[in-house]
Amino acid sequence: MAKRKLSKQQKWRIQKIQDERTKRATRKETQLESQLSGGELSAEQEGLIIAHYGQQLAVEALEPPHAGQIFRCYVRANIDSLVTGDLVIWRAGPDNSGVIVARQPRESALKRPDKFGQLKPIAANIDQILIVIAAEPEPHHNLVDRYLVASEAVGIPPLIILNKQDLINDANRDALQQFKDQYQQLGYEWIDASTNTQSGLDDLKQHLAHKTSIFVGQSGVGKSSLIKMLLPEEDVKVGDLSENVRKGTHTTTTAKLFHLPSGGDLIDSPGIREFGLWHIDEHTLEDGFVEFRPHLGHCRFRNCRHIQEPGCALQSAQESGEILTSRMESFLRIRESLQEQDIHEENL
């Protein structure tokens, strides 16, 4: 996919911001090196980034004697961008402060483009993506498929949750069952749930235990209700975190990590809930439809568009029932939308 072309003014602004950050980092680095060399900090230990506040990060200590405590940490300038979910090596200082000296390797990273079109990590070490749909508003293949392709592209297993199960009735029951059957036949896990009746919630909690998860889905499907049910003290925890960590800085809109009372962790932010197809190419899109994979590369023509070309392996698989028509149509619509986005960005 083509990259967004930046104007001279945008390039100048980016460079100016980077220069200012470098100057601040250099000043902070000098102070940190003084603390490190002066023996003012504790021995190195492992920690978990649970939030990001301006130039400081909230790090949860994972080793005694501070295990479970939250520290406000600065970062050494030679460390790449850190995000919520990163495991780090840090050293404790006075007054709940500290210094991050290294980042552990990431198992996974969720990225999205910034306002300049450059991909930036927003969360790390995610184990599963929970795609929330609902009986109302009616779910659509195209939207679910976009989330599934995005999950496949970053290599993070998805789990589909049909929320608002209490709204299933005679008018929509058969269609929803068919919808469910199609994705289960593709090998995707599925949970029926309702925050109103509490059905399916024990099953959901079991899937969340011992994992780090995120919720995605369109507005109105009940993501907030599910999160509030899983985190009944969320507002209190955010307030406590602000008191202990923010120290007058602005309220963050970046991702926060919460420990679920039932086990497991949840990383949440508005940006994460809008997770989607950001800057993927057509090859990645094709590979994101798992049932396409056995047929890719077997078309008669290398530049086959999978529409009406003779010898198209995907069209043949659709005719034989190996690929559902709804999924093929969804693929073509998504590809068209990506092409439109390419054209839009090239004209910026």
Swiss-Prot record:
Gene Ontology terms: cellular component:
cytoplasm
Q: Does the keyword Zinc apply?
A: yes
Query: CDD domains from the entry?
Result: YjeQ_EngC (cd01854)
Q: Which one of the record's GO molecular function terms can you name?
A: GTP binding
Q: Where is the composition biased (Basic residues)?
A: 1-14
**Compartments where found:** Cytoplasm
Membrane among keywords:
no
Write down a Pfam family by its short name.
Answer: RsgA_GTPase
| Any one GO biological process | ribosomal small subunit biogenesis
Q: Which UniProt keywords apply?
A: Cytoplasm, GTP-binding, Hydrolase, Metal-binding, Nucleotide-binding, Ribosome biogenesis, RNA-binding, rRNA-binding, Zinc
Q: Which amino acid positions bind Zn(2+), per UniProt?
A: 299, 304, 306, 312
Which coenzyme or cofactor does it need? Zn(2+)
Per the database record, which ranges form the CP-type G domain?
A: 116-275
Q: Quaternary structure?
A: Monomer. Associates with 30S ribosomal subunit, binds 16S rRNA.
Tell me the function of this protein.
Answer: One of several proteins that assist in the late maturation steps of the functional core of the 30S ribosomal subunit. Helps release RbfA from mature subunits. May play a role in the assembly of ribosomal proteins into the subunit. Circularly permuted GTPase that catalyzes slow GTP hydrolysis, GTPase activity is stimulated by the 30S ribosomal subunit.
This protein's name:
Small ribosomal subunit biogenesis GTPase RsgA
What organism is listed for this UniProt entry? Hahella chejuensis (strain KCTC 2396)
Q: Which gene encodes it?
A: rsgA
